């Protein structure tokens, strides 16, 4: 089981390396490749390593510019030490003197160095967290019915996970809600676990769950459930999120918090300078709503399908990974000049599906091995060891390409 887990982690590192190469982060790509090789010595990393070397050679001429930019960032980092409370206290004890009189420091500088106090979450985020904490079952968490398809489950998880991830949502109990959401997706996206969950139901599970706690009182009381309901997921909510999105939030955590602090300082300064501060703060939200509305109006039918349908009948292969996909008869005319971008999206979707299916296959195999060891059944053990892993094999082929 440990070897299978290491191979699974190795595949995830290979996927992160591929994403880092696409974004131009060669240092991160090398780290991920070395980690993948360490987890699985049989992993083939030569192709991607050569790709990184080629990228490094092509960008060597811009190294001086990168060095000067790094020096500039270090100077800013040095300037950030002024946020240290001890330094602020020293400056407060040593006021500026002019003509024998003590003068306070400029307000503008003080305001820019003072962190903004108060909550850093929206009412919408708080309402979302509270809604999930009050849910009685997994279907209610994802806001779907019991006949929802796998696509519906993935769609709702994607939408809610981006809103609830701890790096983005800092409302009270957000971590608890994020864990509940991850466990709901892990159970409902697995055919066997979903069937068991539907069979026993949330109420039946609660009657055997010792971690259910009473909250509130009177008619307004609610139960804070153990969201596992006896169907605990093999992966943590963070691992599920990384499987689904390729680890997007964790890699950006530091930079996003820095941008957030800068934005808060800027808004604080703007509020002091302009009476229209509250209105200006609403402008980004209004812009996002308008852009979202326009995007909904402009969205048409997808350009391709990974499966042949009555509309998508023409089979094509991507230029890089030779992934099969299907398009309409007018595809080349409608997407002239954009075919490369479409094929990139095809490969991204294909790899994401393989990654999720590989985790499920590994999970199924590990479950069979565990049951065989628990029952001490050699026949079951042999059957578990022969469990096919087609998605994992295909991922290995792609990374060896």
UniProtKB/Swiss-Prot annotation:
Pfam families cross-referenced by the UniProt entry: DnaJ, DUF1977
Ranges per topology, Cytoplasmic: 1-278
Main location: endoplasmic reticulum
Domain of life: Eukaryota
Region feature (Disordered): 50-122
Domain J positions: 137-201
GO molecular function, one term: Hsp70 protein binding
Topology relative to the membrane: Single-pass membrane protein
Any Gene Ontology CC annotation: endoplasmic reticulum membrane
Gene Ontology biological process terms in this record: cellular response to misfolded protein; chaperone cofactor-dependent protein refolding; protein-containing complex assembly
Residue spans, topological domain Lumenal: 300-401
Sequence similarity: Belongs to the DnaJ family. DNAJB12/DNAJB14 subfamily.
Function: Acts as a co-chaperone with Hsp70 required to promote protein folding and trafficking, prevent aggregation of client proteins, and promote unfolded proteins to endoplasmic reticulum-associated degradation (ERAD) pathway. Acts by determining Hsp70's ATPase and polypeptide-binding activities. Can also act as a chaperone that promotes maturation of potassium channel unc-103 by stabilizing nascent channel subunits and assembling them into tetramers.
Protein name per the record: DnaJ homolog subfamily B member 1
Highest classification ranks of the organism: Eukaryota, Metazoa, Ecdysozoa, Nematoda, Chromadorea
């Amino acid at each position: 089981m440990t070897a299978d887990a290491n191979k699974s982690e190795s595949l995830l590192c290979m996927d992160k390396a591929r994403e880092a190469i696409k974004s131009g982060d060669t240092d991160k790509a090398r780290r991920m490749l070395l980690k993948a090789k360490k987890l699985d010595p049989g992993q083939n990393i030569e192709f991607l390593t050569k790709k990184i070397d080629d990228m490094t050679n092509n960008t060597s001429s811009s190294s001086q510019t990168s060095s000067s930019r790094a020096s500039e960032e270090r100077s800013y980092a040095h300037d950030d030490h002024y946020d240290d409370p001890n330094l602020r206290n020293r400056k407060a004890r040593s006021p500026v003197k002019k003509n024998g009189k003590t003068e306070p420091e400029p307000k503008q500088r003080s305001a820019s160095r003072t962190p903004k106090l108060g909550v850093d979450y929206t009412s919408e985020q708080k309402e979302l967290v509270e809604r999930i904490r009050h849910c009685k079952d997994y279907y209610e968490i994802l806001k779907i019915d019991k006949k929802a398809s796998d696509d519906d489950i993935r769609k709702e998880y994607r939408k809610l996970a981006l809103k609830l991830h701890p790096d983005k949502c800092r409302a009270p109990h957000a971590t608890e809600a994020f864990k509940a959401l991850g466990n709901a997706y892990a159970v409902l996206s697995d055919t066997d676990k979903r069937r068991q969950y539907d069979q026993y139901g949330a109420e039946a599970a609660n009657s055997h769950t010792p971690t259910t706690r009473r909250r509130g009182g009177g008619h307004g009381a609610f139960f804070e459930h153990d969201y596992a309901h006896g169907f605990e997921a093999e992966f943590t909510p963070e691992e599920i999120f990384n499987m689904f999105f390729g680890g997007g939030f964790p890699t950006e955590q530091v930079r996003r918090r820095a941008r957030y602090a800068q934005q808060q300082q800027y808004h604080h300064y703007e509020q002091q300078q302009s009476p229209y501060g509250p209105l200006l703060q609403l402008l980004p939200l209004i812009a996002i709503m308008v852009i979202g509305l326009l995007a909904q109006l402009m969205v048409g039918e997808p350009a391709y399908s990974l499966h042949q349908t009555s509309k998508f009948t023409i089979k094509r292969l991507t230029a890089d990974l030779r992934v099969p996909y299907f398009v309409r008869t007018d595809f080349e005319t409608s997407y002239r000049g954009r075919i490369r971008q479409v094929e990139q999206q095809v490969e991204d979707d294909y790899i994401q599906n393989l990654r999720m299916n590989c985790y499920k296959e590994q999970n199924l195999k590990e479950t069979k091995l565990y049951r065989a060891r628990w029952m001490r059944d050699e026949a079951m053990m042999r059957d578990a060891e022969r469990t096919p892993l087609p998605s994992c094999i295909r991922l290995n082929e792609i990374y060896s390409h």
